[in-house]
């Protein structure tokens, strides 16, 4: 079983310090929501992000959206060989049941995440998505993998197919992919740093390479 964690993801509700900012207020009003209940999104809240620490990397739910679409629609997931988790910058962990169908439409995805932040589970009863306050270290300790790998541009260079073989040789490997646009991980992560290419790659590209090359050896 491969455990994939999209970590330090820039997925959060609008922070209290900027809920009165016109960009947030007007956006929330258009959507008939309270400012504190909307997902922070750099596309709409660029001017408000300038007021935040690390503002240049925050408000990127699109990264999580594309990563989840790719991972949950993969053959590995359909064959029961994959578990996917999202860890956020504020140390929340989203547990995702393999049968979950993430909305392809981005606006619907945003609405789903806002409901999850508000209610802790969605949909009520089925709990396909469940959120808990938990650090990345606590999640890793809970999963108890027999190998932890951190995808990092300064990691040990390894060809994707070679890395897939390494993962396939373990019972319960865990791979961490950054859910942020640039910069480094905020969390301290134990594990071996791995780089699959000579230049930086987008998170969803890394997710694809990991899963496809893992599938090559296990399916």
From Swiss-Prot:
Catalytic activity: a pseudouridine in rRNA + S-adenosyl-L-methionine = an N(1)-methylpseudouridine in rRNA + S-adenosyl-L-homocysteine + H(+)
InterPro entries reported for this sequence: Alpha/beta_knot_MTases, Rbsml_bgen_MeTrfase_EMG1/NEP1, Ribosome_NEP1_arc, tRNA_m1G_MTases_N
Positions of disulphide bridges: none
UniProt keyword list: Methyltransferase, Ribosome biogenesis, RNA-binding, rRNA processing, rRNA-binding, S-adenosyl-L-methionine, Transferase
Site-annotated residues for Interaction with substrate rRNA: 60, 101, 104, 108
Top EC class, one word: transferase
NAD found in the keyword field: no
Subunit and partners: Homodimer.
Function: Methyltransferase involved in ribosomal biogenesis. Specifically catalyzes the N1-methylation of the pseudouridine corresponding to position 914 in M.jannaschii 16S rRNA.
Protein name (Swiss-Prot/TrEMBL): Ribosomal RNA small subunit methyltransferase Nep1
Organism (species): Thermococcus onnurineus (strain NA1)
High-level lineage: Archaea, Methanobacteriati, Methanobacteriota, Thermococci, Thermococcales
Gene designation: nep1
